Amino acid sequence: FEDYYEREAETWELQALTRARVIWASSPAFQARAEGAIAVALRRPRDPKRTAVDVLEMRQLMEDERPGKGDWDLKLTPGGLVDIEFAAQFLQLVHAAQGGPLAQNTGEALAALGRAGLGDPAALAALEGAWRLEQDLSQLLKVALEDGHDPDTEPKAFRALLARAGGVREFRS
């Protein structure tokens, strides 16, 4: 693991590693070693411009290979959860070597990056707010609708609930 992440890991693998957590370990010592190895891999210095290019290329590849299924695919649609996650992962990767915060949860990462002054405060606040909104709406849609169902076809009361969850007066897709 340590050798691979030092010599061979691509940026997308490091992006995924920002979300890694040890679920089970055979001993507390092994857990500490695993957590330490993750932190070392993430805290290596990296070129911000190269990292930005890599992240943008991976996002484009995802969009080409697995596009969103419409406006209500809150994860994959442009501006959706994946874009917010990629922004948080990018900022963590480029600032970690200088002691920037690392957090597995995207909302916590954005908040920590904001507190550390590692990005435009208004942009980070907007990303965090959008992430929370999309989390709330995603949960509501998962509970209320079958996969692939279009909220536009739902009864007026359900659309009003979506509008309220989204903090707007009325529902319009």
Model regions and ranges:
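A nucleotide- and high-energy phosphate-metabolite-utilizing enzyme signature
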Residues: 1-173
